[in-house]
């Protein structure tokens, strides 16, 4: 499901209100706070995740199709296209996270290609660090104006599901200690090795 924020009754900012689709703004009515919007986003996320996970489990969605720049944009659009004008579009402005906007396309494509190449051509990885590597690489780049966390968590689960070769299937458990998680993400940014982050993030049975 991703790592849940604690919004409370925090109101949407002016920029956020401007980026809402008119139909969503009308649906929210006078109570335009982040908590209500998060619930709406989460309902869409559950539906999208269930369909794509089923496709990954049943072989209709191969890892070669998931670990691509095109897929991540399409996934972001599916998750947010009913709510936000920026869904599926790479960010165009500098922020204090990620790479420069003009580098996003190249960094996303090359970063995912590198991870997929390592998965195909080395024997020192299994499914668990592969999925976490995809998650961490997306967050390193921070390609979207918003929604990077939820998108990268679902990408990780899809990669994990599509590459497991066992009778029992597992997902990542995203309810984790946030300070340690953020510290390990920063370490990944320096050395680009997902092993330590993969060891930290637990897994759970798909049927739990």
Which role does the model predict for each range below?
Residues 1-208:
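FIC/Doc superfamily catalytic core
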């Amino acid at each position: 499901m991703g790592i849940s924020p604690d919004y409370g009754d925090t109101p949407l900012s002016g920029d956020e209100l401007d980026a809402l689709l008119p139909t969503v703004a009308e649906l929210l009515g006078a109570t335009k706070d982040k908590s209500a919007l998060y619930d709406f986003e989460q309902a869409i996320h559950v539906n999208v995740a269930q369909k794509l996970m089923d496709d990954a489990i049943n072989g209709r969605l191969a890892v070669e199709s998931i670990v691509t720049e095109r897929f991540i944009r399409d996934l972001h659009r599916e998750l947010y296209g009913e709510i936000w004008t920026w869904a599926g579009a790479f960010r165009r402005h500098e922020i204090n996270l990620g790479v420069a906007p003009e580098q996003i396309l190249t960094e996303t494509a090359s970063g995912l290609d590198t991870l997929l190449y390592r998965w195909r051509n080395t024997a020192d990885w299994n499914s668990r660090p592969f999925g976490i590597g995809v998650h961490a690489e997306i967050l390193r780049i921070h390609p979207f104006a918003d929604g990077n966390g939820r998108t990268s968590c679902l990408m990780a689960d899809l990669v994990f599901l599509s590459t497991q070769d066992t009778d029992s299937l597992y997902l990542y458990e995203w309810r984790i200690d946030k300070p340690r998680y953020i510290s390990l993400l920063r370490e990944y940014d320096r050395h680009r090795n997902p092993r330590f982050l993969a060891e930290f993030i637990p897994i759970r049975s798909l049927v739990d």
